[in-house]
Amino acid sequence: MEIKLNKYIDHTLLKPEATKQDIINLCNQAIQYDFATVCVNTCWTSLCKELLKNSNVGITNVVGFPLGACLTEVKVFETKKAIENGCDEIDMVLNIGALKDKDYDLVLNDMKEVKKAANEHVVKVILENCLLTKQEIIKACELAVQAGLEFVKTSTGFNKSGANVKDVKLMSEVVKTKLKLKLLVELELMMMQSQW
């Protein structure tokens, strides 16, 4: 059976200096390669909706990005506005400080409230593994399962490292079949697959 990798790719542009033309180019590439979604900041959702209207490409928006340190109410507001403007999926950033403080109720509530605000839309949580210990990664994955999210992701791309084989194996062991796993992978890191 042939696996179409392109349908698993969120073609992403989250740089603060991204221009309208950059977003147009991103959407054109996503259509050309039939990617799953474009992942953009919420200010670009309406433009992407217009550009992608005759395609099978969806729109992912980030909330609490890139730090995850904002109030849950802010993430909920961002989520509602993103969906109102036409986004299909939400990538929320984990409240890393709360996880490190072992304030698991806050972390769980943060995820649950975003999921609730997203209604039936897919919600992924970005863990930022390079800032977490092994035990923190495990706990974050367990909380994501408990919150009813669909995916856990490795990183924002705004910190010191993205996906690595060790973390991906750990995350997949924890979430097993309960959640899906998304990796932040730069093109040259695709060579990691040879290590599986």
From Swiss-Prot:
<dbReference type="GO" id="GO:0006018">
    <property type="term" value="P:2-deoxyribose 1-phosphate catabolic process"/>
</dbReference>
<protein>
    <recommendedName>
        <fullName>Deoxyribose-phosphate aldolase</fullName>
        <ecNumber>4.1.2.4</ecNumber>
    </recommendedName>
</protein>
<dbReference type="GO" id="GO:0004139">
    <property type="term" value="F:deoxyribose-phosphate aldolase activity"/>
</dbReference>
<dbReference type="InterPro" id="IPR002915">
    <property type="entry name" value="DeoC/FbaB/LacD_aldolase"/>
</dbReference>
<dbReference type="GO" id="GO:0009264">
    <property type="term" value="P:deoxyribonucleotide catabolic process"/>
</dbReference>
<comment type="function">
    <text>Catalyzes a reversible aldol reaction between acetaldehyde and D-glyceraldehyde 3-phosphate to generate 2-deoxy-D-ribose 5-phosphate.</text>
</comment>
<dbReference type="GO" id="GO:0005737">
    <property type="term" value="C:cytoplasm"/>
</dbReference>
<feature type="active site" description="Proton donor/acceptor">
    <location>
        <position position="182"/>
    </location>
</feature>
<dbReference type="InterPro" id="IPR011343">
    <property type="entry name" value="DeoC"/>
</dbReference>
<feature type="active site" description="Proton donor/acceptor">
    <location>
        <position position="91"/>
    </location>
</feature>
<comment type="similarity">
    <text>Belongs to the DeoC/FbaB aldolase family. DeoC type 1 subfamily.</text>
</comment>
<keyword id="KW-0704">Schiff base</keyword>
<comment type="pathway">
    <text>Carbohydrate degradation; 2-deoxy-D-ribose 1-phosphate degradation; D-glyceraldehyde 3-phosphate and acetaldehyde from 2-deoxy-alpha-D-ribose 1-phosphate: step 2/2.</text>
</comment>
<feature type="active site" description="Schiff-base intermediate with acetaldehyde">
    <location>
        <position position="153"/>
    </location>
</feature>
<dbReference type="GO" id="GO:0016052">
    <property type="term" value="P:carbohydrate catabolic process"/>
</dbReference>
<keyword id="KW-0963">Cytoplasm</keyword>
<dbReference type="InterPro" id="IPR013785">
    <property type="entry name" value="Aldolase_TIM"/>
</dbReference>
<keyword id="KW-0456">Lyase</keyword>
<dbReference type="InterPro" id="IPR028581">
    <property type="entry name" value="DeoC_typeI"/>
</dbReference>
<dbReference type="Pfam" id="PF01791">
    <property type="entry name" value="DeoC"/>
</dbReference>
